[in-house]
């Protein structure tokens, strides 16, 4: 079940109506903290938008990172949606129209790994650099860890982040994420 909430009262109404179901509450990134806290207190999951069909719909990286850090500290599960068609951050067409404008989009790999690293304890400015990383070749993936520069997260860290905080992401496309994972040799 999903719903949108711009107030803590709206979060409470969604919680009351979703009793017995796993519910995601879409909250705005602007002034998200009281809403995210209310979502967590009610045992719900958060949802935030990370893009759209215009450049203005993409949040500032610092705002998204602030949300991720807060969700990890509070152990509030969340999913991200919109604009996450691509593996890595980069400049891409905003729609599937041939003459579409381009904009800078987050990569689903960046967003998830940022959550995994933060959940595993990353507290310095490196998390923002990770969220902004554009080169998949800067990552080394093995059967027991993912390394980025001199930092790494184990598969147990990744599993914990996936189970506890960064539970899913939404993309308008199934093929693009899978194709880009194949192209980067991250999946067979």
What kind of feature is each model-predicted range?
Residues 1-188:
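Expand to "…catalyze enediolate/carbanion chemistry for C-C bond making/breaking, isomerization
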């Amino acid at each position: 079940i999903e719903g949108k909430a711009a107030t803590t009262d709206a979060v409470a109404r969604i919680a009351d109506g979703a009793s017995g179901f796993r519910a995601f509450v879409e909250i705005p990134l602007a002034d998200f903290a009281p809403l995210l806290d209310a979502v967590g207190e009610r045992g719900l999951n958060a949802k935030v938008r990370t893009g759209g069909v215009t450049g203005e719909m993409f949040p500032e990286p610092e705002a998204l990172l602030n949300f991720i850090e807060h969700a990890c500290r509070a152990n509030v599960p969340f999913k991200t949606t919109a604009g996450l068609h691509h593996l890595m951050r980069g400049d891409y067409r905003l729609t599937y129209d041939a003459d579409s404008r381009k904009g800078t989009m987050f990569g689903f790999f960046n967003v998830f790994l940022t959550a995994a690293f933060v959940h595993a304890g990353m507290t310095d400015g490196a998390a923002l650099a990770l969220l902004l990383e554009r080169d998949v070749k800067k990552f080394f993936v093995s059967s027991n860890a993912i390394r980025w520069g001199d930092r790494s997260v184990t598969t147990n860290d990744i599993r914990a982040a996936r189970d506890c905080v960064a539970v899913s992401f939404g993309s308008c496309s199934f093929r693009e994420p899978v194709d880009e994972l194949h192209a980067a040799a991250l999946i067979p």
